[in-house]
Regions:
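Rossmann-like NAD(H)/NADP(H) cofactor-binding core
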Residues: 47, 98-101
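A conserved pocket-lining segment of Rossmann-fold NAD(P)-dependent short-chain dehydrogenase/reductase
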Residues: 112-134, 138, 142
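Mid/C-terminal beta-alpha module of Rossmann-like enzyme folds, strongest
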Residues: 140-142, 149-196
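Rossmann-fold cofactor-recognition segment
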Residues: 1-3, 20
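NAD(P)-cofactor binding segment of oxidoreductase domains
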Residues: 10-48
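Conserved Rossmann-fold NAD(P)-dependent oxidoreductase catalytic core, especially the SDR/UDP-sugar
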Residues: 33-74
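Glycine/proline-rich active-site loop of Rossmann-fold NAD(P)-dependent oxidoreductases
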Residues: 80, 93-95, 105-118, 137, ...
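Catalytic helix-loop patch of NAD(P)-dependent Rossmann-fold dehydrogenases
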Residues: 59-99
Length: 203
C-alpha cells in the first residue's frame, strides 16, 4: 500500500505509465484516477506504454494506428482493455492521455548481439512471421518529442518500418560477428516453451 496517496502527484506535471495491466485492468487508472483528476490542472502530459500485441494476427499485413484491434493473446487482450480505460479517462476528464504501442524492444544489454556473446542465441525458424522492433533510445526520443508537443487522445506506433522474421535478424548479427555455431529450432519443435510461442500469436 502507498501511504499518503493523495500527495503522491504533488508537483508532478508529466506521468508515464509503463506498468503491465492485470486481469482487473490498469493499476494506475484503477488506483489513482481520482487523485489524477484532482491534479489535472497541473498535469500537462500523461503517456501510456501499450503494445503492438493489441493488433493480433493480420497474417503479416501492414497495420497502422487506425487498424482494427483483434488481439488473440491474453497479453494483447489486456493491453486493449487498458488502452480503452486510458482513452475513457481522456474523454471523461480531459486528462492529456497519449498511447504508445511498442513492439520488441532492444538496446544495450538487450539485443541478439548480447545473446550471441553470452552463448544464449537460439534461432526460431518460422517463415513469413514478422516482428517489428524499436531501440530504447528511439522510444525515449519519441516520448520527449511528445511531451514537448502534446497531442492528447492520440495513439502512436513506435517501431521500425522494416519488419523481419526473427531468425533472419539473428543470422545477420551472427554474420557481422563471424559466428557460425548457434542453436536452431523450427517453430513446431516441442522444446520451445509456450511462453515463447505466445509471442508468435501476432503477425
Amino acid at each position: 500500500l502507498i501511504k499518503e496517496k493523495d500527495s503522491i502527484f504533488d508537483g508532478v506535471n508529466v506521468l508515464l505509465n509503463s506498468i503491465p495491466p492485470k486481469k482487473n485492468g490498469d493499476l494506475v487508472v484503477k488506483n489513482f484516477s481520482n487523485i489524477i483528476v484532482k491534479k489535472k490542472k497541473t498535469i500537462n502530459w500523461f503517456g501510456y506504454f501499450s503494445s503492438t500485441s493489441v493488433y493480433g494476427d493480420h497474417s503479416g499485413n501492414w497495420v497502422d494506428e487506425e487498424t482494427e484491434l483483434t488481439p488473440n493473446s491474453q497479453r494483447g487482450i489486456l493491453r486493449k482493455k487498458s488502452e480503452a480505460q486510458h482513452l475513457k479517462f481522456f474523454k471523461d476528464h480531459k486528462i492529456p492521455i497519449h498511447i504508445f504501442r511498442l513492439p520488441g524492444i532492444y538496446g544495450p544489454g538487450r539485443s541478439v548481439i548480447d545473446k550471441i556473446k553470452e552463448g544464449k542465441a537460439v534461432e526460431i525458424v518460422k517463415e513469413g512471421h514478422f516482428f517489428s522492433r524499436v531501440h530504447v533510445e528511439d522510444i525515449a526520443t519519441a516520448i520527449a518529442k511528445s511531451i514537448n508537443k502534446s497531442t492528447p487522445g492520440e495513439i502512436f506506433n513506435i517501431c521500425d518500418d522494416l519488419p523481419t522474421e526473427s531468425y533472419k535478424v539473428l543470422r545477420y548479427a551472427a554474420k557481422l560477428m563471424n559466428v557460425k555455431n548457434f542453436k536452431s529450432l523450427n517453430f513446431d519443435d516441442p522444446k520451445i516453451s509456450s511462453k515463447i510461442k505466445s509471442f508468435y500469436h501476432d503477425n
